[in-house]
Every structure is written in C-alpha cells, then in structure tokens.
C-alpha cells in the first residue's frame, strides 16, 4: 500500500491563447472542471499503476468534496482517512492552460486542505506505518506534512516529499526524506542554486542531499529528470511528445515512480517508467482525467524499445 498525505482540489480550467498581463482581461475557452490537487493526483496515479493507494486529507462537506472522493473511489483509492470538514469549503484551483504550449498558470484556494493537522495525521499512524511508502507535498499544513514524514521514518517506510508549492524547509524535515522530488523552480529556491541546465540541476540536487535528503530527483519538464541518488546519479531524458496540457504531469511522474520503486525496480528504471507515464499525461487535458493506466505506460515503453 502507498499512502498519500496531501491535497484534494477541484480544478477550474480555462484554455487561453496567451497568459494575460497584469490588469488585462482576455477571452478564453469554456470553463472546464476536473478533479485534482497534488495529493489526490498522486494517489490516483498510484491506483492507475495497479498498486493499492490510500488518501489522507481534508475536503469540505460540499458538492466538490463529494465529487473528488467519488472520483478517487472509482479507481480504487481508499478514502476512509479523508476528513469531510464541516464549515470549510473544498479546495479549488483556477488553472489557465496555454493553447499552444500546454503550459499552465495556477492559483490555489486551499480551503479544507489547510485544516489538516498533525493530530489528524497521527490519528492514522497505524495506516501510515503499514504502508510501503508515504508521499506528501506542501498543499496542506506544514505540521501535517512533517508528522507524515516522521511517522514514515520511525516505521522504516519509504518517505517521499514533493516540495510543491515552494515553501522554505528546515533541514530537519529534509533529513526525514528518503526521496525529495522538486521541479527546477523549487530546487532552485530550496538549494539557492539557479537551475538552468543539467549541470546546475546536479549542483542543486547535491546541495539538497548535503542538507539531509537521502536521494533527490529534480524534474525538468521536457528536459527529463536529474537523479542524485545513493544507488545511481545521472540524467534520465523525457520522452518527446506534443504537449496539450502539463497539469498533473509531475504528480503522474511521482505516483508512477514510487509505485515501481516499491515493487523493487532500480532507480533508473523507476524514473524512466515515471517519465513515460508523465509523457502520456501531457498529451491529454485535465489533471486526473489525463493520468494513464499501467497498461498504457507499458505499451508506450515497448513501442519505444525502453
């Protein structure tokens, strides 16, 4: 079982021909809604890869909350540890997606996600301690994330932190991370090293390992992933595809990567599998609707001789 402690958001998506300037109004396409949130996306990806997934988080007692829970349950995610918090609105994300590049700009209203406490996480310690891996991000409260990583470490379980969105992190938290997986922007800010190429990605990853993270993967979008791990270091290239929407690409990568890792795959193989899953995801619109099945990922890899 892989347990994800994190956010659940309803995504409100508008495709635009370009991103607006400050003070400017532009026309976009019709509003679309899709279930998302970094935590929920990662749990959804784990389930789509065929592994048992458990979600820990908070939603409101509203229609968005019910829809998000239903969407996770539909692919087999265990949502019994998701709290429906009375008086709080479910998290929402406003997402602008560029028509041509598929790049996005996102503003998140955290809502109930921010009400998840360390005490809530500790209340399900047994579930976390029985997991093969625990994944967390930074869209819920920092104390909740810290509690999840601490429980995983104390139980000898694989601990994975996706430090998104960026927040300053103490070395004490990094020292609880078996795998720290930032993107280039988060790595730049956490390591105080501007990531602009593979050499600087390696420098940032090394700096984060020096602060205590056991292994670091810096995701570089179309540039692939730089791996700075105990077992292997180097670059894993992305698979070239025509991107339509990059929302949830990183979450898809993490869910697929961790799944293969707990199944016993070597780091390079697990990263390549994650890259394949993310490559498929960016060719489809939406967050969870874009996440491929394991069969699709394996077929994609076979077609490319990987």
Q: What are these model-derived regions, one by one?
A:
Residues 167-172, 198-306:
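Conserved phosphate-binding/catalytic region of the ribokinase-like
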Residues 120-124, 133-203, 222-225:
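Conserved beta-alpha-beta core of the PfkB/ribokinase-like small-molecule kinase fold
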Residues 44, 92-96, 105, 224-227:
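Short beta-strand scaffold segments in enzyme catalytic cores
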Residues 1-58, 63-77, 242-244:
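Glycine-rich phosphate/adenosyl-contacting loop at the front of the ribokinase-like
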Residues 58, 82-85, 95-133, 138:
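Conserved phosphate-binding/catalytic loop of the ribokinase/pfkB sugar-kinase fold
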Residues 75-87:
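A glycine-rich helix N-cap at a beta->alpha junction
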């Amino acid at each position: 079982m892989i347990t994800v402690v994190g956010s659940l958001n309803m995504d409100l998506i508008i495709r635009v021909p370009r991103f607006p300037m400050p003070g400017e109004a532009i026309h976009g396409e019709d509003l679309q809604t899709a279930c998302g949130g970094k935590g929920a996306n990662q749990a959804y990806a784990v389930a789509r890869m065929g592994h048992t997934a458990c979600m820990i988080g908070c939603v409101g007692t509203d229609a968005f909350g019910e829809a998000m829970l239903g969407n996770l349950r539909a692919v087999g995610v265990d949502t019994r540890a998701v709290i429906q918090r009375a008086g709080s609105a479910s998290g929402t994300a406003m997402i602008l997606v560029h028509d041509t590049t598929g790049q996005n700009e996102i503003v998140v209203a955290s809502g109930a996600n921010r009400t998840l406490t360390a005490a809530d996480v500790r209340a399900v310690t047994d579930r976390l301690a029985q997991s093969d891996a625990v994944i967390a991000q930074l869209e819920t409260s920092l104390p909740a994330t810290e509690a999840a990583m601490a429980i995983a470490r104390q139980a000898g379980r694989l601990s994975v932190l996706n430090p998104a969105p960026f927040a300053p992190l103490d070395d004490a938290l990094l020292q609880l991370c078996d795998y720290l997986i930032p993107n280039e922007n988060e790595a730049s800010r956490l390591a105080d090293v501007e990531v602009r190429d593979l050499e600087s990605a390696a420098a940032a990853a090394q700096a984060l390992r020096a602060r205590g993270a056991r292994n670091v993967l810096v995701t570089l979008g179309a540039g692939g992933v730089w791996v700075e791990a105990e077992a292997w270091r180097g670059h894993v290239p992305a698979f070239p595809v025509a991107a339509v929407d990059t929302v949830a690409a990183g979450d898809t990568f993490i869910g697929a990567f961790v799944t293969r890792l707990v199944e016993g795959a070597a780091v390079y193989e697990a990263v390549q599998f994650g890259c394949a899953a993310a490559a498929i995801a960016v060719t489809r619109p939406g967050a969870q609707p874009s996440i491929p099945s394991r069969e699709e990922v394996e077929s994609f890899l076979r077609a490319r001789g990987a």
